[in-house]
């Protein structure tokens, strides 16, 4: 059974019909605003990639990928878990220049996801990637992009409230962002777990960008797992918002400046993944054949949850839930799609 939290006195702000209208509105408005802000262009995205290319996202390195072989060729393919590495290659293949980028509507299956109010085995997100200069690989550039994304969220929210007056009782988010490193967070809350630290900082400060995820902290453990072959662990982070119905923080976006040849070399060794060096994607990065980029994924259902004040991700996306979860939600008046 998936884990579930039933908030007290929770009532959805919109009925099912208006929820569907609002979901479409959020996806259209936010994508348009994000593209204008970051100079992105939409491209078509694959649902699966060849296993031998190394293009699939390994996430934390333990999640099983949905894999099958094709009838005609027998090639082994994998349903994508994200497009983090595919996008960087696509920027080169499609001829994108510095200052321009792409985004796509990414749909993924994560079979090993621990399902709860915020997590589903079905993942839908805007996957985006942008070509940058080598000198843009710094914290100031990363923070400016984070602020742009948060501003796009706030602009979408303002327009949504104007179109759906039923949402006007929900608190509006501000464009203010707190930036803190994982080590600073551990130092601030040494007796809390990583998730408890996130809850504490976001409850205290609101929207927070937690930086430098992947490398071990002074405690000897990383704040969270990160694959060694796309984000630079010194130039990445998670964008966290506060979920009012659930009274917890949650990640809207994981993003970062991507690995250089030097940082990929270090991170592959640190993670014990030197065997990946011969994969086509990894060889291209290590040989300096791919552009410097920044990118990330922004959860579509997560953003809809945030702006509609939803208590369960199943209110804004159609997925599979066990009977106990469906019965508990129905009893509590939480309508799952």
Can you say where each PLM-predicted feature lies in the sequence?
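Generic recognition of stable, solvent-exposed alpha-helical segments in well-folded globular domains
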Residues: 18-25, 29, 137-144, 148, ...
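Extended, charged alpha-beta segments that form solvent-exposed binding/catalytic grooves
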Residues: 104-194
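A glycine-rich phosphate-binding loop feature that marks nucleotide/adenosyl-phosphate handling sites
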Residues: 47-51, 165-172, 324-326
